[in-house]
Amino acid sequence: MHEITLSQRALEIIEQQAQQAGARRVTGVWLKVGAFSCVEASALTFCFELVCRGTLAEGCELHIAEQQAECWCERCQQYVHLVSQHVRRCPLCNNDQLQIVADDGLQIQRLELE
């Protein structure tokens, strides 16, 4: 379960940003998870709540959005979006030789601080 490691790393960054801003508390966190990142939203939520105990982010509201994977199709020379790691064909030309160019794992999109 790599969600615990992702949660720990995200919390380190969140706490650093909160401290730099002089915040007393983190009340909201918005994360973006890549479609091919193999991150389970429910496991991430559980792990995030666990690692936040006793920190500035304890009790914060966690928002998770899934990012579509962006791929480059050599055949039709277009960027395309895929929503499932199980369907890896270009929706425009049905080519199966796609290069994934953006599926950024986990990104912190926004923080709400007090």
Curated annotation (Swiss-Prot):
GO MF term list: nickel cation binding; zinc ion binding
Family note: Belongs to the HypA/HybF family.
Cross-referenced Gene3D superfamilies: 3.30.2320.80
Disulfide bonds: none
Keywords: Metal-binding, Nickel, Zinc
Residues binding Zn(2+), per UniProt: C73, C76, C90, C93
Annotated positions binding Ni(2+): H2
Described purpose of this protein according to its UniProt entry: Involved in the maturation of [NiFe] hydrogenases. Required for nickel insertion into the metal center of the hydrogenase.
This protein's record includes keyword Ion transport: no
Record organism: Klebsiella pneumoniae (strain 342)
GO biological process: protein maturation; protein modification process
Protein's UniProt name: Hydrogenase maturation factor HypA
